[in-house]
């Protein structure tokens, strides 16, 4: 690499590149010293040769004066974070190298203390539960969420989403908080759901600012909205803020759909409009929380990728995301035209015409084509908020609304066997991410595979299409689809998944923080699934992905939750190759079957808590 090429790079990345290509004589960490340690063995040489010298030469210590300490926010590292803040319209940005799970916990730990009230989106990722409810002794007021048929995660329900209702709930729980202008210290919201619904940030900022000091938008599954004109009001960081508005924090998983290495994340802070107010979160307080959660031995190329992401988006963000938006639309159109059982999740007809009959240019600029309220009847959901759109950069395909019902896990495995990796799948949905680097060749390969699965695989033996399964299914692929669907129907799996998130069915026994303390202290009992109803959970229980808590720590296990996880248990035993992963439940082998158990508060401990 010559000097002219390096000059085109942003400062931190340019310095790291210079460092990596110069001969070094390190006596500091990391101990592999540019790969020299590995190269002492045959296996190590294979390792370094495959990954290339740059990967090892770029792994340097923060003892190096040229590059400095990335956690200090000074020098070249500070310049990189400042570039990101300018690019994404933040007052200040923190680079986080351990994922948005850590970013969320940093923000919650900086803002919340014992006794606070928090408005809490029930769709939040488990890291929000951990940071807000398990680590901080706060009281949540949950916001109702939507589940569509097929297990598809919608946004917030319009039910109960009124200031008066939320203020009344705060008064019921903590009357003393009503003396404050804002009864809630923080609102924790998902800007974009895993299944591709994105919230109108402007609406939620206006709605919740009279109630909350701060709003934390988890934008792990977004980050590009400010570069797409269609989503102009959906970016929390580009909205004009008044002194009456809440302070804004936004966390982004740069590695998901932006241009970052795995684990890269960033926190954006925008609150200069309340800097002289009592509720203001000083940068030093957030930085203190940041330093509690990060490593003092960062991998510098991760930091560099965050700077490069900011650089690329500052120069060409809108152009690049126009390309991704166009790709997402064209790919959906082709799937609609060539597939019969697998179809994109879309509103359907617009003004009496099929969605795919419109010009791509129209679809790119008109929100009617992404309005998911039009799907309410078809998808079996009520109380849909008008303040969400289908995310145009997430291609969510349904597998239960076409000619034949197909379990999405079966389709996912088929595609992965052909080196096509979906982001995730639910019961009847499968997600593909649209990004600026995607090509028509990739889309064509995907569409061909989808079409082949529908037309050429159903009558083939399972062992021919899926030769590496853990057990033998002596049937055709079509018959296997029918068998799995029968299991789903027998357990009313779709209805159970929807009911799992109805708030009226949930009862809190103790706080999440207290549940965690009991779990750590040994005040716990491992109980089989069938005996869980009415017991207080000590761990958050969920299916993963997406990592949304079905039962939160401190809540009582309901009959619905027990029935839902009983279905998952049966799924694991009947079709182990296709069953989802459980988190917060523990598998034991009993008489040749897998049984689910969960940690709960012992009954004697419950009596003691009541007496106190």
Regions picked out by a protein language model, each given a short descriptive name:
Residues 55-102:
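Conserved N-terminal alpha-helix of the aminotransferase class I/II PLP-enzyme fold
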Residues 86, 100-113, 117-336:
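Conserved PLP-enzyme active-site core in the AAT-like
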Residues 44-55, 96-108, 166-178, 380-384, ...:
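Short, composition-biased local secondary-structure segments
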Residues 1-58, 65-66, 74, 86, ...:
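Non-catalytic terminal extensions of PLP-dependent enzymes
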Residues 89-91, 113-114, 183, 201-202, ...:
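Short, well-ordered loop/turn elements at secondary-structure boundaries
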Residues 94, 141-143, 423:
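General small-molecule cofactor/ligand-binding pocket signal
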Residues 71-79, 102-103, 301, 326, ...:
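Generic alpha-helix structural propensity
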Residues 94-96, 187-190, 430-435:
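Short glycine-rich or small-residue beta-strand-to-loop segments that form or flank ligand, phosphate
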């Amino acid at each position: 690499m010559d000097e002219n090429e390096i000059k085109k790079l942003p400062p931190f990345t340019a310095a790291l590149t210079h460092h990596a290509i110069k001969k070094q004589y390190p006596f500091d960490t990391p101990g592999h010293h540019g790969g020299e340690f590995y190269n002492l063995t045959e296996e190590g040489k294979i390792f370094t040769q495959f990954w290339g010298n740059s990967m090892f030469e770029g792994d340097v210590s923060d003892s190096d004066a040229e590059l400095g300490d990335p956690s200090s926010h000074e020098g070249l590292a500070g310049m990189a974070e400042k570039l990101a803040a300018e690019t994404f319209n933040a007052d200040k940005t923190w680079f986080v190298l351990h994922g948005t799970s850590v970013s969320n916990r940093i923000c919650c730990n900086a803002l919340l203390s014992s006794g606070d009230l928090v408005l809490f989106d029930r769709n939040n990722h488990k890291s929000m539960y951990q940071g807000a409810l398990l680590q901080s002794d706060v009281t949540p007021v949950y916001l109702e969420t939507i589940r569509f048929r097929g297990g598809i995660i919608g946004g917030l329900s319009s039910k109960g989403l009124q200031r008066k209702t939320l203020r009344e709930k705060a008064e019921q729980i903590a009357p003393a908080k009503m003396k404050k202008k804002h009864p809630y210290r923080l609102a924790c919201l998902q800007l974009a759901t895993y299944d591709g619904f994105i919230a109108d940030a402007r609406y939620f900022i206006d709605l919740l600012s009279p109630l909350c000091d701060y709003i934390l938008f988890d934008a792990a599954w977004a980050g590009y909205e400010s570069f797409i004109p269609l989503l102009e009001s959906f970016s929390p960081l580009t909205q004009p803020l008044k002194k009456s508005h809440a302070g804004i924090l936004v966390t982004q998983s740069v590695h998901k759909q932006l241009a970052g290495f795995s684990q890269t994340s960033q926190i954006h802070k925008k609150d200069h409009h309340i800097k002289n107010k009592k509720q203001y979160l000083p940068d030093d307080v957030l930085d203190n929380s940041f330093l509690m959660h990060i490593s003092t031995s960062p991998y510098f190329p991760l930091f560099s990728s965050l700077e490069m992401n900011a650089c690329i988006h500052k120069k060409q963000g809108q152009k690049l995301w126009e390309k991704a938006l166009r790709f997402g639309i064209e790919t959906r159109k082709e799937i609609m035209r060539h597939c019969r059982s697998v179809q994109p999740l879309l509103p359907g007809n617009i003004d009496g015409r099929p969605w795919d009959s419109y010009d791509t240019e129209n679809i790119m600029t008109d929100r009617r084509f992404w309005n998911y309220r039009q799907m309410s009847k078809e998808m079996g959901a009520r109380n849909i908020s008008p303040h969400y759109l289908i995310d145009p950069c997430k291609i969510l395909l349904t597998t239960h609304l076409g000619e034949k019902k197909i379990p999405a896990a079966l389709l996912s495995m088929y595609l992965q066997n052909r080196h096509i990796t979906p982001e995730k799948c639910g019961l009847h949905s499968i997600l593909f991410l649209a990004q600026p680097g995607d090509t028509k060749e990739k889309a064509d390969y995907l569409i061909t595979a989808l079409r082949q699965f529908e037309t050429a695989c159903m009558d083939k033996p399972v062992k021919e299409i899926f030769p590496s399964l853990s057990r033998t299914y002596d049937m055709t692929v079509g018959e296997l689809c029918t068998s799995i669907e029968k299991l789903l129907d027998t357990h009313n799996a779709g209805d159970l998944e929807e009911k799992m998130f109805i708030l009226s069915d949930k009862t809190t026994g103790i706080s999440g923080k207290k549940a965690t303390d009991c779990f750590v202290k040994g005040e716990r009992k491992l109980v089989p699934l069938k005996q869980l109803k009415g017991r207080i959970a000590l761990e958050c229980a969920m299916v993963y992905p997406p990592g949304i808590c079905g039962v939160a720590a401190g809540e009582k296990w309901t009959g619905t939750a027990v029935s839902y996880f009983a279905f998952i248990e049966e799924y694991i035993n009947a079709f182990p190759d296709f069953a989802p992963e459980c988190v917060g439940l523990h598998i034991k082998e009993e008489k040749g079957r897998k049984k689910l158990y969960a940690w709960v508060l012992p009954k004697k401990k419950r009596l003691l808590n009541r007496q106190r």
